[in-house]
UniProtKB/Swiss-Prot annotation:
It comes from the Bacteria. GO terms for molecular function: ATP binding; metal ion binding; protein-exporting ATPase activity. The gene is secA. Pfam families: P-loop_SecA, SEC-C, SecA_DEAD, SecA_PP_bind, SecA_SW. It is found in: Cell membrane; Cytoplasm. Zn(2+) binds at residues 876, 878, 887-888. Its EC number is 7.4.2.8. It catalyses: ATP + H2O + cellular proteinSide 1 = ADP + phosphate + cellular proteinSide 2. This is Protein translocase subunit SecA. It is a peripheral membrane protein. NCBIfam families: PRK12904.1, secA. Monomer and homodimer. Part of the essential Sec protein translocation apparatus which comprises SecA, SecYEG and auxiliary proteins SecDF. Other proteins may also be involved. It comes from Rubrobacter xylanophilus (strain DSM 9941 / JCM 11954 / NBRC 16129 / PRD-1). PANTHER family: CHLOROPLAST PROTEIN-TRANSPORTING ATPASE, SECA INNER MEMBRANE COMPONENT OF SEC PROTEIN SECRETION SYSTEM. It is an enzyme of class 7 (translocase).
Length: 902
């Protein structure tokens, strides 16, 4: 053991001693609390709340509050949290991660910090990996909270708005990370305060924290809007790409998950499409179509990265084997896969709101988590979330036996050995859990077992409906269960099946005989651990418990540990082993030459296995290499998203102010916009004789109905300030006229007993709604531009420039441009408010198309669309040399000439 490890372990020991002292304080209050009546126990909640208001802290209340929850759990559920569970609860209250092994009762652990933090009255969120677990945990632990006078809500995907609002208003809310995240995004595209559901992000406990905060960190949550149509192109490229040859027409880098066409490949594609140059400016969208079609063809495999069900493509979570409902690959990849599989293409959507899991959860005032496997990712938790990992001791000693890996030359030989092992274990009655890395492998093994006549269950993304039922029965005698990765995580596998206790089964001589054999075989197992168990449960324990068989090492050691952790719960016996082959992706891609030379030196027969420390070390090194790479990828994603996150915070804060009734200072927007216009046409740095007052009048009319008579100016003595004062005074008068007209018309409608069609009660409300629509529209366009910038920024590295620095700089410029666009759009709108419907569609139409001086003076003939929409940052087709958004794509700009129109 090196010095650093010793120091770290000493630190761990000190932490556990401090936690133990807190546990002793909780236990010291137990006799007093146990003597209270139900009513007196319930009354402690109000007492705690009063003490908080009186200046005491949650830390002051912790020993008493935890003792109260411990007693209520005993009375309502018949479960008394062990000392190690109380210890885990303290860690969660401290905003840290409690690493607790499978079967240690994490669900019960959470009740103590949840209750304590709910006393503050600001809401507590308990985050789970799926809807089933959210509902199960809320119902299971609900009696504790309800006994203590707290309300419990649960969020489910199928819930409507009113149900969600009620669930969030409760003291404690259970739900999935996706539901909490999407509700946050929906709140930030709401158009009235009545549409908000969430309260402040106060305190959250994340169950299976490694799965949610690390494994899903690379997948952003996205709410999308209406699409652009390009289905035919996806099908065309799906037909072209299979005709290309790897190595000649394109190169694939499986490690980096990248693909690149060669010059020869590009020439073939150009010929197939009948175009002279794929990289010509008007064909830039075709390059992305080619890249995504190549990725879909080479890197994404059916029944591994995705499945096809009911004519739709569903992403499969590589870590859990579950279908990621509602998630789609971005940048056209999902559509490329749909075209490859020949199913209907669902059009690309425009991003309306997006946030990464990382940045959503970093917003909580206090964040805690629990899992069975976090130690290997401790650095990442600290770096990204500032969360410390604390390993909690098990209640009973762990006696599972983890066997060395067996490595075969080929997958075929490996699977044959796996099936033989399963058959042998099944015949003696030992339950077997087989872990696979993909749906494809699980179904292949299932077919092999069927040939051998072995009854079994398959748990993968295709059979997720029966997940809890299948996993709960995986510990029955003779059961064989094949599961993709950690499908079924969160559900305990009890030896003998879900009814481990046998429903109060009376013990016989056979029970006694088995109990004696077990205690003789396993000295750490005591009689009280066996009492009350069913005969089947005792038989399974005597057979060695659950046997976990991994068919491939995962990229992350943590996922392997999770699989192993399904066995040996609460001091039960268990066994685990991984079967590998040199053809496995991990060994093939990351094992390097060492593995190849080892294989050649040993000269293995196909059906022979090696079981050597050298192989295990090579596997560990390969896993560490991948873990490091994945951490760097997540870290880089976060660095880029942090740029957008700061901008998001600004925009969402503005929206929230508008939404909550903050009065809009319209005149300040008018002053900013018109001052900018005046500085371009009548600058104080230019002689008045050189001012373009005619051009100024025309430009001002694009923003408001200008009535300034510039001919009255004495041009020789005029100043820029004088011009500014004239314009702003006129603009102020026109705004007041608009306001007066509005109020007059509204009053007239009221006199007639009518209501406004747009539902706006006052000009103030109209100002708020208009600004909100403009902010949303411009933010959507900005998200598109930032995504466009992000996709191409990597090439800056070739010019010896740091892509991240460039992204920050250009992202800031785009944000400043967006802010100016918001001001200009708002001013244009507010002066014409009586003539326009206040909808986001109209705001977008104004932003992207243009028109005359008045929005209702549009050309009567419809504008033609070419196949491709002109991007805001592309050169304007009119030939001016300016970006499109600065020229004919600008608010109020005249339409392009017919031959060039969009």
């Amino acid at each position: 053991m090196n010095l650093l490890t010793k120091i770290l372990r000493m630190g761990e020991g000190r932490k556990l001693k401090a936690l133990q002292r807190t546990v002793e304080e909780v236990s010291a209050r137990e006799p007093e609390v146990r003597g209270l009546s139900d009513a007196a126990l319930r009354a402690r909640t109000d007492e705690f709340k009063e003490r908080l208001q009186g200046g005491e802290t949650l830390d002051d209340l912790l020993p008493e509050a935890f003792a109260v929850v411990r007693e209520v759990a005993r009375r309502t559920l018949g479960l008394r949290p062990f000392d190690v569970q109380v210890m885990g609860g303290v860690v969660l209250h401290q905003g840290k991660i409690a690493e607790m092994k499978t079967g240690e009762g994490k669900t019960l652990v959470a009740t103590m910090p949840v209750y304590l933090n709910a006393l503050a009255g600001r809401g507590v969120h308990v985050v789970t990996v799926n809807d089933y677990l959210a509902r199960r945990d809320a119902e299971w632990m609900g009696p504790i909270y309800e006994f203590l006078g707290l309300e419990v809500g649960v969020i489910q995907e199928s819930m409507g708005f009113e149900e969600r609002k009620k669930a969030y208003a409760a003291d404690i809310t259970y739900g999935t990370n996706a539901q909490f995240g999407f509700d946050y995004l929906r709140d930030n595209i709401a158009t009235s305060p009545d549409q908000l559901v969430q309260r402040e992000l106060h305190y959250a406990i994340v169950d299976e924290v490694d799965s949610i905060l690390i494994d899903e960190a690379r997948t952003p949550l996205i709410i999308s809007g209406l699409p652009e149509s390009a289905a035919d192109l996806y099908y065309r490229f799906a037909a072209i790409v299979p005709r290309l040859r790897e190595g000649e027409d394109y190169e694939v880098d499986e490690k980096k998950r990248q693909v690149a066409p060669t010059e020869q490949g590009v020439a073939k594609v150009e010929k197939a499409l009948g175009i002279p140059n794929l990289y010509d400016g008007v064909n830039t969208n075709l390059v992305n179509h080619l890249i995504q079609a190549l990725r879909a063809h080479t890197l994404f495999r059916r029944d591994r990265e995705y499945i096809v069900r009911d004519g739709q493509v569903f992403i499969v979570d590589e870590f859990t084997g579950r279908v990621l409902e509602g998630r789609r690959y971005s940048e056209g990849l999902h559509q490329a896969i749909e075209a490859k599989e020949g199913v209907e293409i669902k059009e690309e959507n425009q991003t309306v709101a997006t946030i990464t899991i990382q940045n959503y959860f970093r917003q909580y005032e206090k964040l805690a988590g629990m899992t069975g496997t976090a130690a290997t990712e401790a650095d990442e938790f600290m770096h990204t979330y500032k969360m410390e990992v604390v390993s909690i001791p098990t209640h009973r000693p762990m006696i599972r036996v983890d066997r060395d890996d067996l490595v075969y030359r080929t997958k075929k030989a490996k699977y044959a050995a796996v099936i033989d092992d399963i058959v042998e274990r099944h015949r003696k009655g030992q339950p077997v859990l087989v872990g696979t890395v993909s749906v494809e492998v699980s179904e292949h093994l299932s077919a092999l077992l069927k040939r051998r006549g072995i009854k079994h269950n398959v748990l993968n993304a295709k059979h997720h409906e029966r997940e809890a039922e299948i996993i709960a029965e995986a510990g029955k005698k003779g059961a064989v269960t094949i599961a993709t990765n950690m499908a079924g995580r969160g559900t305990d596998i009890k030896l003998g099946g879900s009814d481990e206790s046998g429903g109060g089964e009376e013990w016989t001589e056979e029970h006694e005989r088995l109990a004696s054999e077990i205690m003789e075989k396993y000295p750490t197992i005591t009689r009280d651990m066996l009492e009350g168990r069913s005969l089947e449960s005792l038989e399974v324990v005597n057979l060695g418990g659950l046997y976990v068989l991994g068919t491939e090492r995962h990229e992350a050691r943590r996922i392997d540990n999770q699989l192993r952790g399904r066995s040996g719960r609460q001091g039960d016996p268990g066994e685990s082993r991984f079967y590998l082959s040199f053809e496995d992706d991990l060994l093939r891609l990351f094992g390097g030459q060492r593995m190849q030379s080892l294989m050649e030196r040993i000269g293995l027969e196909e059906d022979e296995a090696i079981e050597a420390g050298m192989v295990s070390n090579s596997v560990r090194r390969a896993q560490e290499q991948v873990e490091s790479r994945n951490f760097q990828m997540r870290k880089r994603i976060l660095e880029y998203d942090d740029v957008l996150n700061k901008q998001r915070e600004v925009i969402y804060a503005i929206r929230r102010e508008i939404l909550m009734g903050e009065k809009v200072d319209t005149m300040s927007y008018v002053e900013d916009v018109l001052t900018d216009v005046i500085s371009r046409y009548a600058s104080e740095d230019v002689y008045p004789e050189e001012w373009d007052l005619e051009g100024l009048a025309t430009e001002l009319n694009r923003f408001y109905p200008c009535q300034v008579d510039f001919s009255s100016l004495d041009i020789e003595s005029a100043t820029a300030d004088q011009v500014r004062e004239m314009v702003l005074e006129d603009a102020r008068e026109r705004l007041e006229e608009r306001r007066a007209e509005w109020e007059e018309r509204t009053a007239e409608l009221e006199r007639r007993g009518l209501a406004r069609a747009d539902g706006l009660d006052s000009f103030e409300e109209a100002e708020r709604r208009t600004l909100l629509s403009v902010v949303d529209s411009r933010w959507r366009e900005h998200l598109y531009e930032m995504e466009y910038l992000r996709e191409g920024i990597g090439w800056r590295g070739l010019g010896q420039r740091d892509p991240l620095v460039e992204y920050k700089r250009e992202g800031y410029d785009l944000f400043v441009e967006m802010e100016r666009g918001i001001r200009e759009d708002y001013v244009t709108y507010i002066y014409r408010i009586e003539n326009l419907k206040l909808s986001e569609t109209d705001v977008e139409r104004l932003s992207y198309s243009g028109g005359g001086e008045e929005p209702n003076q549009r050309p009567k003939s419809p504008r033609r669309r070419s196949e491709r929409k002109i991007g805001p940052n592309e050169p304007c087709p009119c030939g001016s040399g300016k970006k499109f958004k600065k020229c004919h794509g600008r608010v109020g700009a005249p339409p392009l000439p017919t031959s060039q129109s969009q």
